[in-house]
A protein has these predicted regions:
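Glycine-rich phosphate-binding loop signature in dinucleotide/nucleotide-binding domains
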Residues: 23-28, 108-109, 142-145, 181
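Beta-strand-turn-beta hairpins that frame and shape the catalytic cleft
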Residues: 1-4, 107-113, 180-186
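Active-site neighborhood of phospho(di)ester-bond hydrolases with catalytic His/Asp-centered motifs
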Residues: 6-7, 31-36, 57-62, 115, ...
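Acidic, His/Gly-rich catalytic cores of divalent-metal-dependent hydrolytic chemistry
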Residues: 164-247
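Active-site environment of divalent metal-dependent phosphoester hydrolases
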Residues: 10-15, 39-41, 65-68, 107, ...
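Anionic-ligand binding region
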Residues: 133-177, 182-185
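Active-site neighborhood of divalent metal-dependent phosphoester bond hydrolases
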Residues: 47-145
């Protein structure tokens, strides 16, 4: 199966539309969304609806959790907290209910696992080799057949790899990764809607489960339109400004 794996869309419809156009030309058969479809951006419902129309697999990110329960936003900065309150007000009761029912983890096929921040914890961060080792240990206990897990939350493309008896290694991806026999992987596709790796393009990946191949994609989109919509919605200008910088 060929899958588009997306994370951290953050209500950025122009970015999501550009990514959709890109993966539509790549023979993608399914879409997996790793959470935080909402928050920060100005078009949460349109992004949720677009992914639903694609029959995407959804899991919850911390922004979905905050849209369900504002107490979950206690650790947000002022711009993020204002955006999630605005998002909550804009979404229908039915849509919020659907968000509240999303799982925090999911296995879409044997040997594959999805989570947002850390397994069972959408607010945790996976960004060190030490944390990577803990996640690999957790996944071994959960299901030793898991070969690759996809996660988001950091807004940065990243790969962790582990071979039994060897230390975990973390590295930034190139354009393509071939999954090596015997190795396990934790893979972050980067953010569609608010990259933080210094590259403002929309990031995602394409996973070919039969070939064991991952292609990392960076897609230009109309950043100016996304910024204009954020400002028109009355959200923080900082959320608009950062899009052009990829921070």
């Amino acid at each position: 199966m060929i899958v588009a794996v997306l994370a951290d869309v953050h209500a950025n419809l122009p970015a999501l539309e550009a990514v959709h156009a890109d993966f539509s030309a790549e023979g993608v058969q399914s879409v997996w969304s790793l959470g935080d479809t909402v928050g920060y951006g100005a078009e949460p419902f349109a992004c949720l609806q677009m992914l639903a129309d694609l029959d995407a697999v959804f899991i919850a990110g911390n922004h979905e959790q905050a849209a369900c329960d504002l107490a979950e936003a206690n650790g947000f900065n002022s711009a993020a907290a204002h955006a999630i309150r605005w998002t909550r007000d804009k979404l229908s009761t039915d849509t919020r209910t659907n968000l509240c029912e999303l799982p925090v983890n999911f296995s879409p096929q044997p040997g594959v696992f999805l989570f947002h921040g850390l397994p069972g914890n959408a607010t945790g961060y996976l960004r060190t080799e030490e944390t990577g080792q803990m996640v690999f240990d957790h996944l071994t206990d959960r299901d030793p057949r898991i070969r690759v897990a996809f996660f988001g939350h950091t807004h940065r493309p990243m790969i962790f790899t582990h071979l039994t008896g060897r230390p975990v290694r973390m590295f930034e991806p190139l354009e393509e990764l071939i999954l090596a026999p015997g190795r396990r992987y934790l893979v972050n596709p980067g953010s569609v809607g608010q990259p933080r790796n210094g590259d403002p393009n929309a990031h995602y990946l394409i996973y070919d489960s039969e070939e064991g191949r991952i292609k990392f994609r960076k897609v230009p989109y109309d950043i100016g339109t996304a910024q204009e919509r954020i400002l028109q919605a009355g959200l923080s200008p900082s959320l608009a400004a950062r899009l052009s910088q990829g921070i």
